[in-house]
């Protein structure tokens, strides 16, 4: 089975312009994401998708593969779909371009169900919530799954709600109650991704600003794999300090 990882990378960012080209201990962030992604045993090919020539030049400079996209895409999924249409592959892994510490084992875990079951169109990851602050944080997306590991819902709201317990009870952790956060790494079958990108924005997607709800609202299953590995994403220049500290400690 052919599996391609695509890393969408934009130069423009309201909080951190030029983020993919930020340097982390001598390497650009996009190079670190690319190299970590390539370490996943299941990945045959890694492609950076960008609309910016500066990013393209850097990727080509370190020997990576890059494909240019249109600049008018509304979402990262649309950019991903444009590149996917040109690639001869069966599975597409969407790796975020601001995850310089992405664990290759996370990619392998997300890919496994789709490799084993051709009926699954889409997959992603979840990890236990660490504390009640995360549970209440709307920037931390929560996910609820059924007994087979398929998503029932994703939300920025604190779900599910433990009715019999105050959510600030320090004696009980959210992890001990089976509460999970979503990790934004996705795996798609190529044909499904192209179909998905062509669907109109759904009501719940519009409300929560979560693209994966478009799949659920249209009746598509999303397999969610649990992992205890968590990456450190970079949203602001201050986050670079945490990433560098982690790398120095390795």
UniProtKB/Swiss-Prot annotation:
Biological processes, Gene Ontology terms: CMP-keto-3-deoxy-D-manno-octulosonic acid biosynthetic process; lipopolysaccharide biosynthetic process
Localization (cell): Cytoplasm
The UniProt record lists the keyword Glycoprotein: no
Encoding gene (name): kdsB
The protein's name in its UniProt record: 3-deoxy-manno-octulosonate cytidylyltransferase
HAMAP family: KdsB
Family to which this protein belongs: Belongs to the KdsB family.
Pathways involved: Nucleotide-sugar biosynthesis; CMP-3-deoxy-D-manno-octulosonate biosynthesis; CMP-3-deoxy-D-manno-octulosonate from 3-deoxy-D-manno-octulosonate and CTP: step 1/1; Bacterial outer membrane biogenesis; lipopolysaccharide biosynthesis
Keyword tags: Cytoplasm, Lipopolysaccharide biosynthesis, Nucleotidyltransferase, Transferase
Keyword Nucleotidyltransferase listed: yes
Matches recorded under Gene3D superfamilies: Spore Coat Polysaccharide Biosynthesis Protein SpsA, Chain A
Described purpose of this protein according to its UniProt entry: Activates KDO (a required 8-carbon sugar) for incorporation into bacterial lipopolysaccharide in Gram-negative bacteria.
Cellular component GO terms held in the UniProt record: cytosol
